[in-house]
From Swiss-Prot:
Positions in coiled-coil regions: none
Family annotation (SUPFAM superfamilies): HD-domain/PDEase-like
Entries under Pfam families matching the protein: HD (PF01966)
Lineage of the species this protein comes from: Bacteria, Pseudomonadati, Pseudomonadota, Gammaproteobacteria, Enterobacterales
Domain HD: start-end pairs: 26-132
Membrane-spanning intervals of the chain: none
Stated name of the protein: Uncharacterized protein YedJ
InterPro entries: HD/PDEase_dom, HD_domain
Domain of life: Bacteria
Gene3D superfamilies given in the database record: 1.10.3210.50
């Protein structure tokens, strides 16, 4: 059975059993992560079925950002994937299940589980790249809006004189997590892409800063200077 067969099997199952997830964790997200993972894996001798499966099930359990057990999401997702592969996909190669589950458990930023295989490193990078760039920008404000989080602190949007708090202000999430992601990348290509996409977020911050100052045609170069080295 080839990868296209398994991808079709997974998508069909998810469309019937995973329909009510937010846009940051839906089937389209899984598909994008898989597309990115294929690019990251292009020059490596890796098990693509392990990567495909982990990409499609890494968020099969995804607790809300404000859930007290949020950091356990990837562990719970790995446990659920193990069950699903054994019970719902009986023809899936049993010898690959633990490698899939490790890649899923290790993908999460909050779980802090080190990826020990090349497959797990690729899945982690592919998922983290989704948090950067234009898609990442859209996701931040979509998720924050759903949680009732303010866009930014109008008095101090970049937290120059206050502690960062991304539970109150969506923009703070750029500094608490997103701009740090390039430093966590496991693959050379992943790091390169992460730095490129993080720069897009910095440019957004610079444009926002200019607009808040009443300047609608330029960007705040002080913001670019302050944050461009974050990755």
């Amino acid at each position: 059975m080839d990868l296209q067969h398994w991808q079709a099997q997974f998508e069909n199952w998810l469309k019937n059993h995973h329909q009510h997830q937010d846009a940051a964790h839906d089937v389209c997200h899984f598909r994008r992560v898989w597309a990115t993972a294929q690019k990251l894996a292009a020059d490596d001798d890796v098990d693509m079925l392990v990567i495909l499966t982990a990409c499609y099930f890494h968020d099969i359990v995804s607790l809300a950002k404000n859930h007290p057990q949020r950091q356990r999401s990837s562990i719970l997702a790995a446990e659920e994937t193990r069950r699903l592969l054994r019970e719902e996909f009986e023809q899936f190669p049993a010898e690959k299940i633990e490698a899939v589950c490790h890649a899923i458990a290790a993908h999460s930023f909050s779980a802090q589980i080190a990826p020990l295989t090349t497959e797990a490193k690729i899945v982690q990078d592919a998922d983290r790249l989704e948090a950067l760039g234009a898609i990442g920008l859209a996701r931040v404000f979509a998720v924050s809006g759903a949680l009732g989080v303010a866009l930014f602190d109008g008095e101090d949007p970049f937290a120059q004189h206050r502690p960062l708090d991304d539970k109150r202000y969506a923009l703070d999430h750029f500094q608490t997590k997103l701009l740090k992601l390039p430093q966590t990348m496991q693959t050379a290509r992943g790091k390169q892409l992460a730095q490129h996409n993080a720069h897009f977020l910095v440019e957004f911050m610079a444009k926002l800063s200019a607009e808040l100052a009443g300047e609608n045609e330029g960007v705040d170069h002080k913001v670019i200077d302050a944050f461009s080295s974050a990755g």
